[in-house]
Amino acid sequence: MAPNATRLLQQWGVLDEVLKYADKPEAATFRSYQGDVLSQSPPVSDPRLVSKAPYLVVHRADLLRALLSGTSGHGVEIKLGSEVTEIDFNKPSLRLSTGETFEADMILGSDGERSRCRSFLLGHPDPPYSPGDVVYRISVPMTDVTEEHVAWDLKKRSSVNFWMGKGGHIVSYLIKKDVLNIVLVYAEGAGAGKPMYGPQKADVEEFRAKVADWNPVIQELIGVQGAVCTKWTLFQINELKRWRHESGRFVLIGDAAHAMLPCLYVYPYPEACPSI
């Protein structure tokens, strides 16, 4: 999360809660797939760059937990397991599968790439499609990575690291203080197979095969005991001609309005910005 985002967390009074879970990387390093350093950002922890709003890396679940903690004093009620079956865009109001109806001054449709709200607005189903890109993620416990390990520098010097190669790129960063998240975004093309909605368990050897000739550091991390591999499909949606209702009281935001493929893993920010 860049300072523009954490500054808002600060204004909302939840930054201290986020900091309980977040990591403050020192820099971002861009490498070739073989490990050669191509470019390095200035130290993102430098107070002259980030002022009082830090650059953070945080697990999404921990971020949501912190945001949830800040809702109690603002009269926010969160209803889980609520299936929306109908939206009246003029009132505006929505109806749940239970028959309950809720009216509001404005409704924001933020239900992701498989948005039901988008289909309601367009008047027809509008499913996302896969261009053939997939994500492999390995979560590596760093507790047993010692000074003798080739990946020690990634643990000792907290940073966001990118490796860029043919057909894909990898990004790594620390989460939960002692877990290294390694994410491979890979273009498998038309042969990507059956779409996988959301992370599903995958064979670590499948990940290894994709990066067989990449930096040895990556190979060693894949082999750390306790590493867990998951995989899912990336989706896009067709470009929308409209994402708001003419009444001005309903609008789509986030992936419901503009799901796109990641570019060097800046992907979460387009959806975070309108949501914030």
Residue ranges and their predicted role:
Residues 1-70, 74:
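Active-site-adjacent segment of FAD-dependent monooxygenases/related oxidoreductases
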Residues 57-58, 101, 130, 269:
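Short aromatic/basic micro-patch
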Residues 20, 27, 35-38, 219-220, ...:
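C-terminal helical "tail/cap" subdomain of flavin- and related membrane-associated enzymes
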Residues 34, 65-226:
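Conserved FAD-binding catalytic core of PHBH/FMO-like flavoproteins
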Residues 108-109, 172, 206-207, 228-276:
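Conserved mid-domain beta->alpha element of the FAD-binding
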Residues 44-51, 189-193, 235:
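Short glycine/proline- and charge-enriched loop/turn segments
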